[in-house]
Each structure stands twice: as C-alpha cells, then as structure tokens.
C-alpha cells in the first residue's frame, strides 16, 4: 500500500512538473497540494514535512525484467555489460553480488551490470548455458567475450573488468 502511494506521488509530480537543474521535483500528490474539505467540515492543507526531494544518480546496476528487456539493455548495449546470473537461495551469490556491484561502480560508467535471477528467467539461463550460480558473463557488442563461475576476490574482479573494458 505504501509503495503504491509513493509511486502515485512520484508519477503525479513527474507528469505535472519538469525537473530543475540537478534535482527532481518534490514527490507530492495533488491531494496534498490543494486544500480538501472532508464531510466533517475540516480543511486539510499541504504538509511540508511530506515533501521528498531526490537527486539524479547514475545507475550502473539494473535487474533484468524479461527477455526483451535483456535484448534491449544487454545485447543491444553500446556499453560493455557484466551479466550476473544469480539466485535468491545461493549463498555465494549473496557474497559476489555486492562485491561485483562495487567494482562496476568504480568504473564510472565504462561498464554496467545486469542482474538476472535464474529462477525468474530460466530461458536466459538455458540460452547462455548457465549450469551453476553465480555465473558472470562479460558481454561486448552483444557477444560473450569472457565468463567465470563462482566467487572471485576484488583483484580478480578488477582484472576481469579491465579485460572487458579494454
């Protein structure tokens, strides 16, 4: 319920206003912007404490939603992509995921990371021959250029990323 309300507020603010330099408009609903009268005759006025400001950030990691999303954001990407095939129940995935995200973020946009849950996207796991998790693919111009299975330390991950970037 709270997520739906927050999404509704966000969409209302994005549609009604253009973002200012470096910031999104405040997340408020139209109900909070204009006074409302209730059946009891009470007037509700906007509460400034409910205004939320956000800043624009560059996302280097994203979750794949479906096959066409994978095609669009990974295969057709001009930026090299690290694809992390993982599962919620996988212990090593929970260690590698944050470590890999941190290393990708250090590359400042030279590479991005796509996360694919194999339980939700078994078709992609089969297509890319994922037989164990975590499996990480390095993709450039739609082609798999490197791959590893299992956990790697930060030095090995850095070498993997440098090889992908070129």
Curated annotation (Swiss-Prot):
Q: Which InterPro entries does UniProt cross-reference here?
A: Thioredoxin (IPR005746), Thioredoxin-like_sf (IPR036249), Thioredoxin_CS (IPR017937), Thioredoxin_domain (IPR013766)
State the SUPFAM superfamilies in the record: Thioredoxin-like
Q: Which UniProt keywords apply?
A: Acetylation, Disulfide bond, Electron transport, Mitochondrion, Neurodegeneration, Primary mitochondrial disease, Redox-active center, Transit peptide, Transport
- Indicate where this protein is primarily found: mitochondrion
Organelle transit peptide = 1-59
The record's CDD domains line, in alphabetical order, gives:
TRX_family (cd02947)
Q: What's one Pfam family the UniProt record gives for this protein?
A: Thioredoxin
- Where N6-acetyllysine occurs, the residues are 152
Single GO BP term: cell redox homeostasis
GO terms for MF: protein-disulfide reductase activity
Domain of life, per UniProt, equals Eukaryota
What disease does the Swiss-Prot or TrEMBL record associate with this chain?
Combined oxidative phosphorylation deficiency 29: An autosomal recessive, infantile-onset, neurodegenerative disorder characterized by decreased activities of mitochondrial respiratory complexes I and III, severe cerebellar atrophy, epilepsy, dystonia, optic atrophy, and peripheral neuropathy.
Q: What does this protein do?
A: Important for the control of mitochondrial reactive oxygen species homeostasis, apoptosis regulation and cell viability Is involved in various redox reactions including the reduction of protein disulfide bonds, through the reversible oxidation of its active center dithiol to a disulfide.
Name of the protein in its database record = Thioredoxin, mitochondrial
Species source reads: Homo sapiens (Human)
Taxonomic lineage of this organism?
Eukaryota, Metazoa, Chordata, Craniata, Vertebrata
């Amino acid at each position: 319920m709270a997520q739906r309300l927050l999404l509704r507020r966000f969409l209302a603010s994005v549609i009604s206003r253009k973002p200012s330099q470096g910031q999104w408009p405040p997340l408020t609903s139209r109900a909070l912007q204009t006074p409302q009268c209730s059946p009891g005759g009470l007037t509700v006025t906007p509460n400034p404490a409910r205004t939320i400001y956000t800043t624009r950030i560059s996302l280097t990691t994203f979750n794949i939603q479906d096959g066409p999303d994978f095609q669009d954001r990974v295969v057709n990407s001009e930026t090299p992509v690290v694809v992390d095939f993982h599962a919620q129940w996988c212990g090593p995935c929970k260690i590698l995921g944050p470590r890999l995200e941190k290393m990708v973020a250090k590359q400042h946009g030279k590479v991005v990371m796509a996360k694919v849950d194999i339980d939700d996207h078994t078709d992609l796991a089969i297509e890319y021959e994922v037989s164990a998790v975590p499996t990480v693919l390095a993709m450039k111009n739609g082609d798999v250029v490197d791959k590893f299975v299992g956990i790697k330390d930060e030095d090995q991950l850095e070498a993997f990323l440098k090889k992908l970037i070129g």
